[in-house]
Amino acid sequence: PENHFAGPAALSAPLILLAAAAARTHTIDLGTTSLVLPIRHPVSVAEEVAMLDQIAQGRLILGLGRGFSEDLFDVFEVDPRQKRALFKQSLTRMLSIWAGDPIHQKDDRALYLSPRPHQSPYPRLWIAAFGPLALKQAAAFGCPYLASPMETFAELSQNLAQYRAALKAADQVQPEVVPVMRTIFITEDAA
């Protein structure tokens, strides 16, 4: 996931990393687990994601999140109490832009996104969701929720049930996948 100010563990620019991976690969899908949307301008994200999806020739999966670190919100001057509203506003605008609606209109002149994403109308979207409000928000958009690596299997089962109920309440179709993050360690040492 996107991670700022974490020393060697930092990943502050996941889209740039994926662009490098897209240039070196041809068949694997490429994705973010959680690009932090509330700290970014939705037009910039829509443009960068469309370009990345073109470079990746439709292999992009865009995982989005709201963020959780107080330091992150302080540095980017975002009120953390507004993160859900900003997320909803930004993603709604991005979906509109990717669908071909004008980015901006003044008088008789309209501005549109170019190039559009390779996938139509936009890349596959996953929304990181670790609590009831986030699960409802993912369901409202009809996007798969990206389960936390911190959830136990019992919590995962409970959250999946909440998510499915929220999908039904939002009159959304069950997505084909439920992405789950898990941390694994690979070593030659059996210990």
PLM regions: where:
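Active-site-adjacent structural elements that line small-molecule/cofactor binding pockets in enzymes
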Residues: 1-191
